[in-house]
Amino acid sequence: MRIRVPSKKIRERFLLIYELKGCQKAVDFLTRYYGVRRMRIVLNGRKVGNGDIACYEDNKAYFTKRGLNKSNVLHELYHHLAYVDGWEMSERREEMEADRYARKVLRKTIGNS
């Protein structure tokens, strides 16, 4: 399953909110855009584990200090959207799709496409 990449205007607004107001407000903006419940951002490296820098569980995305960046936030947002919509897919496929989603959102915004 693929989640549609927002329009350039929405992507630019996300980046602006992220830079000026922080990642939680930016994620709130995108969850409103997609019409799903809010995903909470938690900066707590102890909850992450397994050498990962971020993880998603039950409407919360946990990040280490090192892992809190736009790309990882968008990656975990994909997991949230898949969870809320009840999509069933293999862990590997979901990880690949989450990476692809984050890359497309950032590349299309920063690359002026």
Enumerate the predicted regions with their spans.
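Short pre-active-site segment immediately N-terminal to the catalytic Zn-binding motif
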Residues: 56-73, 86-89, 93
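Auxiliary, metal-adjacent structural segments of Zn-dependent hydrolase domains
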Residues: 2-66
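Polar low-complexity intrinsically disordered regions
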Residues: 70, 77, 112-113
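Post-HExxH zinc-binding segment in Zn-dependent metallohydrolases
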Residues: 91-113
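Active-site His/Glu-centered metal-binding helix of metallohydrolases
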Residues: 73-85, 97, 101
